[in-house]
Regions:
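Short, solvent-exposed amphipathic alpha-helical segments in soluble enzyme
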Residues: 54-57, 73, 80-84, 109-111, ...
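Structured core elements
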Residues: 37-39, 55-57, 65, 94, ...
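Short, glycine-/Ser/Thr-/acidic-enriched flexible segments
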Residues: 43-45, 62-63, 70-71, 98-101, ...
Length: 171
């Protein structure tokens, strides 16, 4: 495909430029192909922290099922508020790289940056190198995930196979 991973590193290299404070590696998936089950146990973007894990099913790139729990209903209500079915489309896969950040539900940027987390974004991904347009973008963060892509383990219990944490102050 023509999809390439990107990295948000929170660093500014040029005067007058702006950067996200996020520290993550991400890739926009090919639209309409993502299929699987997400057990959401971290945070729901602007909604906040998840009180108990929610099962979410994705088929052919779109959310098809959200477990009927209090948090599940909040998520459904939030997505429905966009009045845009394209907000249900998988748009980003990301892995947090910041060993200082924590997933607390107070700031979605910090949540998705926390080392050992995985997030899946839904909706628009044009700025990430994808081709999907929607009325917004929304990330769901999960703790200590196991990620399997094409029968290859990318991350096991929050430990990425190719990414190791940097101990700050050692550099």
């Amino acid at each position: 495909t023509d999809r390439f991973p990107g990295i948000f590193h929170g660093s500014l290299w040029e005067v007058g430029k702006c950067s996200s404070s996020s520290f993550e590696i991400y890739i926009p998936p090919v639209e309409y192909y993502t299929t699987g089950t997400l057990i959401l146990d971290g945070s729901m973007g602007y909604i906040g922290i998840v009180d108990r894990p929610i099962e979410i099913k994705i088929e052919n790139g779109y959310i098809t099922y959200i477990e009927d729990t209090e948090d599940g209903r909040k998520l459904k209500e939030y997505l429905e508020s966009f009045d845009d079915l394209e907000m249900y489309c998988a748009a980003e896969f990301g892995i947090g790289l910041n060993t200082i950040s924590k997933c607390r539900g107070a700031s979605y940027i910090e949540d998705e940056s926390a080392f050992g987390t995985f997030h899946i974004g839904f909706g628009r991904n044009l700025a990430l190198g994808g081709s999907h347009n929607a009325r917004g973008h929304f990330d769901l963060v999960t703790h200590n995930p196991t990620i399997i892509v094409d029968d290859k383990v990318i991350m096991k219990d929050g430990h990425a196979k190719a990414i190791q944490p940097i101990e700050w102050g050692v550099l």
